Amino acid sequence: MAKQVFKKIINNQELIVEHGQLAKQASGSVLVRYGDTVVLVTATVNNKLSEVDFFPLTVVFQEKLYSVGKIPGGFLKREGKPSEYGTLSARVIDRALRPLFSENFRNEVQIVINVLAVDNDNDVRMVSLFAASLALSISKIPFAGPVAGALVTVDQKNNIIINPTLEQINDGQMELIVAGTDEAINMVEAGAKEVSENLMLQAILAGHDVIQQLIAFQHEIIAKVGVPKMEVELFQVRPEIITYVNNNYAKDLITAARIKEKTKRYETIEHLIEQAIKNYPMPVSLSEKEQKQLTVELKTALHNIIRQEVRRQILIDKTRLDGRKLDQIRPLSSEIDILPVVHGSALFTRGETQVLSVVTLGALGENQIIDGITDEESKRFMHHYNFPAFSVGETGRMGPPSRREIGHGALGEKVLLQIIPSEKVFPYTIRIVSEVLESNGSTSQASICAATLALMAAGVPITAPVVGIAMGLIKEKNNYTILTDIQGMEDHLGDMDFKVAGTATGICALQMDIKIVGINKAILQEALKAAKKARLTILDNVLATISAPRTHLAPTAPKMKTFMIPVDKIREVIGPGGKMITAIIEKSDDVKIDIEDDGQVTIYHKETTAIEKAYQLIKAIAMPVVVGEKIIGPVVKIEKFGVFVHLKENLDGLIHISKLAKQHVEKAEDIVQLNDIVKVKVIEIDGKGKIKLQLIEILPKK
């Protein structure tokens, strides 16, 4: 197969696709370059039908640290398990691709993204999504694409920027990922600085304009190198099974679906499913594999009855499983100070969804070190989300976080990061853990609400409280209904999970996943409007529990003292091989000390006496004088701009001419003379250690 190269200018930069040279044994493969970002993406299908009752799609995002000129850290010096960024990138791409496969397609498909080179100006996730869609589209794999994505930000003047650089994202009002087909949007992921619903909608639609260009380019390539799609056996339920289920269990299943209490509803449905399988006249001649397949068909037919009834209720009757109105939020409950000892805790309950969030404060030196392909080297704010099986009344796996738990934690972190105070304002590392205790839908948004409460209870001076809500959609052709605060079954049987989080002022994060091909502007607009109304209602509940962050930290939280030392004294404070700083820590009851490059020193400990001891030890080395201190010394030099006073050994300070007297002074010699003994006050020590003084009085000569 000869190598073929395709090129197109997208957003003033060349997008290059190579096909036919690399990874030729995969079902589809492309090498895509945009700027200096290069990815090799393969799509492979298993020709045998799997025995699972869902479409087995896997997206693997392989970060190679050589792509950014790094050698991996650690003892092994090679890539290990995916980083958080890799996991989240794979989820974004998966969410854009999955709606474009038939739900009855049961052959295993694996997308492998090899990140080969990365620059700071071209987002590797968007290049990877484009390449993944193209690899699928030119292959034999049945795929209703192509699909593409765009990265969008909005600058401070509300100008929309497509495919922004890292600097533009950091300076902008949002980081928005939009994905979709040429006709509709099917995935949105955004973090934003309290933007309006209208501005967010404009940015989403602007991103879709670029998506259409990318899809047109894919169509050009598909026409030249695409191959016919494979003949596949789509999963389907046999007519006799549908008849058996409808005749014997449809009425009871519909009644069960209307039970308001989740646990009772699920138990009743599960019992009916067990009875249907047990009572079905299973031919004894069937093999174990055939019996398993028939059981899957029975379960599917039974679940389809529930699905049709729930969707009919919402679309036609405009009623919901638990009797709520379409825009009604479940009962809300908020509590703080749930736990002793910890630095901050809160419990948030919405219906049968309940989350406990706990805040822990630590020294800046306890931040998370990141070894990946992004420019981020560390972070001082973390939000971790745990979803144990008991939260849905089941037994199950306990261990490292799943991809879903990582994703939900990251969404909460994206929201909360917008309201976390800067390091200068609040020099602590902050970790929040959200423990899901009960789940009936939208636990990620409940964790945001609980985390906000816990932060305020902990005394973290957040800029504004933030809460979240999950919206849903039921759509049949042109008839659709939007739901506020979806519960688990509405999420499972619906067409959209649309999460919106923000403050009273605006949106801080947005995440949309759908199961249909896409949605239009009108649905987006309506969902955003309803989400804002719900958000403000939840915010009232949070503020009724605690109206503002506490002005003090918990007694168990580490106390801290921050001060500046001259930059040229940092080395002396640390000492050769760290001996001096180690000695200070040991003499001060194991305090934690952080020293920044600009000379900012922060000392942490539970006891103020230990902090003060460490402060005095550092001061003796690096700060022979402090602001406010009064010192007597001789005038050693006179200049046009002021006079220098000798303070201590190897240490002089400057009295600027404007600080010699209250009235205007023409010449310094009009006030003081060389060798005069003066009393001065230290008024400032700048970042370079230069000492500025104010004259108090000239002492009489002896």
Curated annotation (Swiss-Prot):
Which named protein is this? Polyribonucleotide nucleotidyltransferase
**Annotated localization:** Cytoplasm
Q: Which InterPro entries match?
A: ExoRNase_PH_dom1, ExoRNase_PH_dom2, ExoRNase_PH_dom2_sf, KH_dom, KH_dom_type_1, KH_dom_type_1_sf, NA-bd_OB-fold, PNPase
Q: What PROSITE patterns does this protein's entry cite?
A: KH_TYPE_1, S1
Superkingdom of the organism of origin? Bacteria
A Pfam family: KH_1
Q: Which residues bind Mg(2+)?
A: 491, 497
Reported EC number(s) for this entry are 2.7.7.8
Q: Which metal ions or organic cofactors does this protein require, according to UniProt?
A: Mg(2+)
The record describes the protein's role as: Involved in mRNA degradation. Catalyzes the phosphorolysis of single-stranded polyribonucleotides processively in the 3'- to 5'-direction.
Q: Which GO terms describe its cellular component?
A: cytosol
Classify the main location. Answer: cytoplasm
What keywords is this UniProt entry annotated with? Cytoplasm, Magnesium, Metal-binding, Nucleotidyltransferase, RNA-binding, Transferase
Which family does the UniProt entry place this protein in? Belongs to the polyribonucleotide nucleotidyltransferase family.
SMART domains from the UniProt entry:
KH (SM00322), S1 (SM00316)
Specify the S1 motif domain's residue ranges: 628-696
Task: Identify the species of origin.
Answer: Spiroplasma citri
Reactions that this protein is recorded to catalyse: RNA(n+1) + phosphate = RNA(n) + a ribonucleoside 5'-diphosphate
